Structure formats: structure tokens, C-alpha cells
A protein has these predicted regions:
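Zn2+-dependent metallopeptidase catalytic core
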Residues: 76-101, 131
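Catalytic zinc-binding patch centered on the HExxH motif and its immediate surroundings
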Residues: 105-122, 127-136
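Bacterial N-terminal signal peptides
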Residues: 21-30
Length: 321
């Protein structure tokens, strides 16, 4: 048995040796590229212990409701605080196993927009106000309720931005435009998070593009075709095509009512198959199946009414994310 003093000396030397490895761990993680996922030195150290791989965990979505300074955004902020829709987003994406926490927040931006910038997804109050004002004041002739329109478009936009985050944080390879891939990610989420909700969510999201369906031609500046997003009418047809391809029976009305041109219909099953295959191969390995089953068992469309402005009070701007 070694003298007590020698034991203490050995313990101290071991601690020094371990601590001296921390900078090396950070350097190794940096050289391997995995430090890009680390927010702190502790996370970089954990990556080193995991062989350079990030510590993937579910339940890493955080939410934040920033209080706006603009009095005109106060009503939207109060609605968000009462309804807590970001908590729904948090729950829907809780099965994702991510290397770091991802914060989804609402805030005042000075413009109507939404975006992802690591480690945050930002949804602007100006956009949410516009979304509220664009919704129908009553159930539309096509059966879209104000709740369907608001919830469907809100979840589509939130899912689109979370899609950008997933591609970034999990190093998901893209073989196309990031905005198109984020749209496909969002469409897959809305179609898959519950068959009872899928028609309401898809039709609600599609409602926001309805004005483009009614116009046979739309005049836009040539520079608009250089935008990173597809044209709104293209995004609409892509969304409807994926929905129809996923379930031709459930979404038969998108063809029967002429929302989706019949010339596009034959390709929809293949298009959905490609998106679903990519999701299975690239996203599902990072999903906690137990939590996913809990998400799939729930309803995500509320029955409560959402305060809607009178149609005459709605602003003219109808930009889409």
C-alpha cells in the first residue's frame, strides 16, 4: 500500500494530465470539423471523448418569446404568449437528436421575415401579424378555416426554417437549392405529423398562395427569378404535388378542384417517393422513435378561434417566406 502522500500526488498528476488534454481535444475537434457543432469548450471536450462525434440528444429545441417595443406588435405578442405556439413547434421537433440546443424565437425585426442563423430560428412579429391579417375572416368556400390557414402556414414556415437548421447541424448533404430542400422538409413534416391533421395543415398553408392560383399570369421583375426561393406559385404546386403523391385519396380534391394542374399529377408519386426516401435515409437516423410516436399520436390543429382582422383592415403586402 502506497503512502497517503503518494496517493494524493498520483491523483493530482492524473487531474493535471486530464486537464492538459482539454486544449488538445478542442484542437482535434477543430481539425475534424466537429467543433463547428460545439458551442462551448465542454462540448468540444465531449466530442473528443466521443471520438470526434457530437453528443446527439433529443429534446434540444428551446423557445423564446421576445417582447416587442413597437406598440403595433403588442397584440401579436400577447396572442403568442397566450397560445404558446412555439411550444407546439418544440414538441413536434423534440424527437430530433441534435448536437446542440436550437432556439426557436419570435422577435421584433423591423421587417416581415423568418430565417435560421445558428443556433437560432427567428420568426418576426411583423411576419406573424401579416399572417394573421391574410387569413380568411370565416371558412372559405373551399373549407379552409381561419385556424387552418394560420396554423398551417405558421407550421410550414417554422418547419422550413427548422429544416435549414437540421441540414446545417447534422451535415445533411444537399443536392439542390437549400430553399427547395427546406420546403420539402416542411412538406414532409406537415404530411407525416398526423394523418388527421395533414389535410387541414396542407390546405391551410396552400391558402396563403391562393391569390396566385386565381391569376393566370403574374407579372414580376426579371430579377425576381434570381431569388433563392422559388416563385410562390411554384412552391404551391410543389407542396400540393407532394401531398397528392403521398396520399392520392386524402388529397384527391387538389386535383378534382383544379388546384394542381393535371399535367403535373403523373409525376407526384415519384416526387413524393424521392423526398420520403431522402428523409428516411438522411433524417430518420437522427430521430428518437419513441418520441416520434408520441408526436404522431397527437392533434396539432387547435379548435379555439384565432383573432382575425376584418378583411378591410388587412394590409396589401402579401409576401411569403
Amino acid at each position: 500500500m502506497a503512502p497517503k502522500g503518494l496517493d494524493d500526488f498520483e491523483v493530482t498528476m492524473k487531474k493535471i494530465a486530464i486537464l492538459s488534454l482539454a486544449p488538445i481535444a478542442v484542437l482535434v475537434a477543430w481539425c475534424s470539423g466537429s467543433v463547428l457543432h460545439a458551442q462551448t469548450a465542454n462540448e468540444a471536450w465531449q466530442m473528443f471523448l466521443n471520438g470526434g462525434q457530437p453528443d446527439l440528444q433529443p429534446n434540444r429545441i428551446r423557445v423564446q418569446y421576445d417582447e416587442p417595443t413597437d406598440p403595433q406588435l403588442r397584440t401579436v405578442y400577447e396572442i403568442m404568449m397566450r397560445r404558446k405556439p412555439l411550444h407546439k413547434v418544440q414538441e413536434i421537433f423534440s424527437p430530433l437528436r441534435l448536437p446542440i440546443d436550437l432556439t426557436v424565437k419570435t422577435t421584433q425585426c423591423g421587417m416581415s421575415n423568418a430565417w435560421y442563423r445558428r443556433p437560432e430560428v427567428t420568426l418576426c412579429y411583423e411576419y406573424l401579424r401579416e399572417l394573421r391579417d391574410m387569413a380568411p375572416t370565416e371558412t372559405s368556400p373551399d373549407g379552409v378555416t381561419p385556424v387552418d390557414a394560420v396554423v398551417g402556414e405558421f407550421l410550414f414556415t417554422a418547419s422550413h426554417e427548422v429544416g435549414h437548421a437540421v441540414f446545417d447541424l447534422l451535415d445533411v448533404p444537399l443536392f439542390g437549392r437549400p430553399e427547395d430542400d427546406a420546403d420539402q422538409f416542411a412538406a414532409h413534416v406537415l404530411i407525416r405529423i398526423g394523418k388527421n391533421n395533414a389535410p387541414q395543415l396542407i390546405h391551410g398553408a396552400a391558402y396563403m398562395y391562393a391569390e396566385y392560383i386565381k391569376r393566370p399570369t403574374v407579372t414580376v421583375p426579371v430579377a425576381a427569378f434570381a431569388d433563392v426561393h422559388g416563385a410562390p406559385v411554384q412552391r404551391l404546386y410543389n407542396l400540393l404535388c407532394l401531398a397528392y403523391g403521398a396520399d392520392p385519396v386524402m388529397f384527391a380534391d387538389v386535383v378534382e378542384k383544379g388546384y394542381l394542374p393535371k399535367s403535373r399529377v403523373p409525376a407526384c408519386k415519384t416526387e413524393w417517393g424521392e423526398v420520403d426516401f431522402a428523409f428516411q435515409k438522411l433524417i430518420y437516423p437522427y430521430i428518437d422513435r419513441t418520441l416520434l410516436n408520441e408526436v404522431l399520436s397527437k392533434s396539432w390543429v387547435p379548435y379555439a378561434k384565432i383573432p382575425i382582422r376584418r378583411q378591410t383592415d388587412a394590409p396589401q403586402s402579401q409576401s411569403m417566406r
